[in-house]
């Protein structure tokens, strides 16, 4: 077969990839195809950050499934004019890597007080002394982190409190609810001082812009709203999603807003232009949560049995985590120590090394005494300001606090085995 014939095959692979909506933009091909297009079709590795099918320096690799062997068999490989590694060389290097060891996590405290599911948790990361929770019981409760004792209960919503956001620059907290309202709370007076009206249905998510005095909300009406905190006016409405929006996150630079939705997409928004600058369509089901890395310019997203990380600002796929057995993933959180936590509907707590994608610990939570086993789902999570404590809100109406075992070592507590796959790990 001539090189020209191989390039025709390459064009066909990318035509199929586009048809299957694996990539939104194909004017610049990705450096490595992260997912197999078809088990019986080749995967292209292109040299450099961008390539076109006219470049001759590429490798054709065929994924073959043999009994007991999931491997990569090199069918054809052209010389790489740039001296880049082949797919096989990259895979071998990945196999030889040793992922970072992390100490295992264990339960240290169970906090009772809510009379409904704990839907959301927000941490005060300025002083790192208290946190707030919202529940199906329509209340917001503020707790002392060190003692676990209740400080105050806030009542103003008429329905479930779905999300909370605490300002790092002002003594304000924002809450959103199924009652269609957005409320601003004065934390010095513990009272609601502003209401923001404009959503047509339940509001599911809220976040505060880190540098501009605006708050961003979204929910069942499928639009993202940007509000001026002081005037209470919606300065911008961003349509685009085809279903209810599950989460919004704000960043100080573009994309200044990231949103996820029931329509299985993630949108990166340009607030200056007032439109989405990129749409990520790799997930196949409802994207239930997104979490921004505290120090790396990237974020993670989660849907049922699927966790992925993305490089910002353009939204390139970084890692497809091995998460096919995690059931419905409701929440993900990342700390500054590169630990990614995922909490599932079935009560599973799963911990990954964020950089390598290594799943190093997984176990089930324990429901509160008197609660049925079905009430052990994990709905919300956050790390404290140090990243050393993990807080989870659960369906048994409790908040649980988890810590790493300070006495553990790599010899006494080895992590789960490292079994990387070329099509799922960051290269």
Swiss-Prot record:
Chain residue ranges for the region called Disordered: 404-427
The entry's keywords: Cytoplasm, mRNA processing, mRNA splicing, Nucleus, Repeat, Spliceosome, WD repeat
GO terms under cellular component: catalytic step 2 spliceosome; cytoplasm; post-mRNA release spliceosomal complex; precatalytic spliceosome; Prp19 complex
Cross-referenced Pfam families: WD40 (PF00400)
One example of a Gene Ontology biological process annotation: mRNA cis splicing, via spliceosome
Subcellular location, record wording: Cytoplasm; Nucleus
Repeat positions for WD: 113-153, 156-195, 198-237, 240-281, 283-322, 324-362, 373-412
This protein's record includes keyword Nucleus: yes
InterPro entries the UniProt entry points to: G-protein_beta_WD-40_rep (IPR020472), Prp46/PLRG1-like (IPR045241), WD40/YVTN_repeat-like_dom_sf (IPR015943), WD40_repeat_CS (IPR019775), WD40_repeat_dom_sf (IPR036322), WD40_rpt (IPR001680)
General function of this protein: Involved in pre-mRNA splicing and required for cell cycle progression at G2/M.
Subunit annotation: Associated with the spliceosome.
PANTHER family hit by this protein: PLEIOTROPIC REGULATOR 1, WD40 REPEAT PROTEINPRL1/PRL2-RELATED
Family stated for the protein in its record: Belongs to the WD repeat PRL1/PRL2 family.
Name the record gives this protein: Pre-mRNA-splicing factor PRP46
Native source organism of the sequence: Candida glabrata (strain ATCC 2001 / BCRC 20586 / JCM 3761 / NBRC 0622 / NRRL Y-65 / CBS 138) (Yeast)
Taxonomic lineage of the native organism: Eukaryota, Fungi, Dikarya, Ascomycota, Saccharomycotina
């Amino acid at each position: 077969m001539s090189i020209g014939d191989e390039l025709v095959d390459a064009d066909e692979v990318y035509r199929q990839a586009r048809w299957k909506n694996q990539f939104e933009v194909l004017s610049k091909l990705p450096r490595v195809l992260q997912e197999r297009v078809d088990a019986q079709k080749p995967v292209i590795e292109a040299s450099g950050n961008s390539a076109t099918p006219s470049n001759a320096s590429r490798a054709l690799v065929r994924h073959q499934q043999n009994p007991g062997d999931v491997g990569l068999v090199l069918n054809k490989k052209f010389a790489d004019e740039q001296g880049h590694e082949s797919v096989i060389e990259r895979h071998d290097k990945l196999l030889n890597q040793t992922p970072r060891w992390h100490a295992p996590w264990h339960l240290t405290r169970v906090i009772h007080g809510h009379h409904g599911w704990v839907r959301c948790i927000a941490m005060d990361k300025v002083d790192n002394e208290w946190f707030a929770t919202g529940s199906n019981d329509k209340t917001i409760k503020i707790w002392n982190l060190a003692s676990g004792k209740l400080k105050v209960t806030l009542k103003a919503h008429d329905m479930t409190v779905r999300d909370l956001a605490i300002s790092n620059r002002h003594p304000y907290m924002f809450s959103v609810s199924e009652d269609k309202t957005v409320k601003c709370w004065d934390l010095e007076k513990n009272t609601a001082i502003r209401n923001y009206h404009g959503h047509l249905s339940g509001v599911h998510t809220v976040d505060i812009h880190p540098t501009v005095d605006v708050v961003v909300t979204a929910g069942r009406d499928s639009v993202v709203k940007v509000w001026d905190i002081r005037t209470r006016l919606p300065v911008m409405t961003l349509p685009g999603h085809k279903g209810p929006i599950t989460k919004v996150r704000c960043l100080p630079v573009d994309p200044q807003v990231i949103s996820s939705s029931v329509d299985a997409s993630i949108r990166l928004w340009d607030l200056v232009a007032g439109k989405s600058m990129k749409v990520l369509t790799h997930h196949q089901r409802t994207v239930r949560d997104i979490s921004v890395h505290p120090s790396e310019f990237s974020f993670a997203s989660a849907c049922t049995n699927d966790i992925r990380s993305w490089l910002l600002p353009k939204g390139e796929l970084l890692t497809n985590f091995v998460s096919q057995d995690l059931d419905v993933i409701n929440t993900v959180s990342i700390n500054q120590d590169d630990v990614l936590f995922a909490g599932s509907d079935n009560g599973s707590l799963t911990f990954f090394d964020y950089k390598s994608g290594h799943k190093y610990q997984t176990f089930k939570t324990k429901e509160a005494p008197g609660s049925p086993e079905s009430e052990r789902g994990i709905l919300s999570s956050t790390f404290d300001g140090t990243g050393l404590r993990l807080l989870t809100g659960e369906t048994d109406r409790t908040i649980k606090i988890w810590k790493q075992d300070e006495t553990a070592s790599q010899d006494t507590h080895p992590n789960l085995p490292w079994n990387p796959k070329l099509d799922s790990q960051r290269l």
